[in-house]
Amino acid sequence: MSGLQPPAMDKYLRREMDAAAREFYRRLGDGQLAATRCDRCERATFPPRARCPTCGEPQGWVELPRSGRLHAFTSQESALRFAAPAVLALAEVADVVLPGIADGPYEALLIGQAVRIELRPEPDTGLTLLAFVPDG
């Protein structure tokens, strides 16, 4: 993947993140998939937030399962960072929808399909990305 990233994308990926996003990526780097959750509303949120968007209370962290269902996907033929084509996807995991890369042929993917979630380190950015692998 070296050399495929335009300078503008590098600047975007390395920009200063808020504390909740930094904590999310730190946890991913430690092998934990987590989201923020309001104890009062009992609602998990992603992207992670310091305060609940519904009631404004501070949020804590909850670990998410490593399985979910494919919510949406699309093929990006001119990928900015990935070997083209990349299959960008959203997966429903517990109460949240997470972004990632679908791992499998586009033609074999189905909305609602069960997926397991793998954490994949990205050496160019130092971040860990989510990969959705069809389960079964």
Language-model segments: residues:
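Cys/His-coordinated zinc-binding microdomains
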Residues: 39-42, 56
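A broadly conserved sequence feature marking short terminus-proximal activation segments
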Residues: 1-33, 136
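Well-ordered alpha/beta subsegment
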Residues: 5, 95-136
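Short, conserved beta-turn/loop elements at beta-strand boundaries and strand-helix junctions
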Residues: 73-79, 121-123
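Conserved hydrophobic positions within beta-strands
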Residues: 68-70, 102
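Residues immediately within or flanking Cys/His clusters that coordinate Zn2+
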Residues: 32-35, 49
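OB-fold (S1/OB) nucleic-acid-binding surfaces
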Residues: 82-98
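Short functional micro-motifs and their immediate structural scaffolds
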Residues: 46, 58-61
